[in-house]
Amino acid sequence: MASSGVTVSAAGSASEASEVPDNVGDWLRGVFRFATDRNDFRRNLILNLGLFAAGVWLARNLSDIDLMAPQPGV
């Protein structure tokens, strides 16, 4: 029974990938389904890579700020 559920969700993902949304509502619905699918490896991979990239960007751009330096006008 579990394998049939996986097959159905995999088939649903494959058919979704081949469809082209005709309006913004369909696109948003697809994004919502993509973000809330708990068994989606692609979602986890994209989310983890995005969070990693955001962390790297923050670390690179905030590392040169000296919080102990005297502030102007204080």
From Swiss-Prot:
Q: Does the keyword Transferase apply?
A: no
Alphabetized, the UniProt keywords read: Acetylation, Membrane, Mitochondrion, Mitochondrion outer membrane, Protein transport, Transport
Q: What is this protein called?
A: Mitochondrial import receptor subunit TOM6 homolog
Family indicated by similarity: Belongs to the Tom6 family.
User: Where is this protein chiefly located?
Assistant: mitochondrion
Report the gene name: Tomm6
Q: Which organism is it from?
A: Mus musculus
Quaternary structure and interacting proteins, as annotated: Forms part of the preprotein translocase complex of the outer mitochondrial membrane (TOM complex) which consists of at least 7 different proteins (TOMM5, TOMM6, TOMM7, TOMM20, TOMM22, TOMM40 and TOMM70).
List every position bearing N-acetylalanine.
Answer: A2
Q: Name one Pfam family in it.
A: TOM6p
Look up the signal peptide feature and give its range.
none
The protein's matches in InterPro entries, at most eight in alphabetical order, are given as:
TOMM6
Q: Where is this region: Disordered?
A: 1-21
Low complexity biased stretches: 1-20
Biological process terms from the Gene Ontology for this record are: protein transport
Where does it localize?
Mitochondrion outer membrane
Q: Which GO terms describe its cellular component?
A: mitochondrial outer membrane translocase complex; mitochondrion
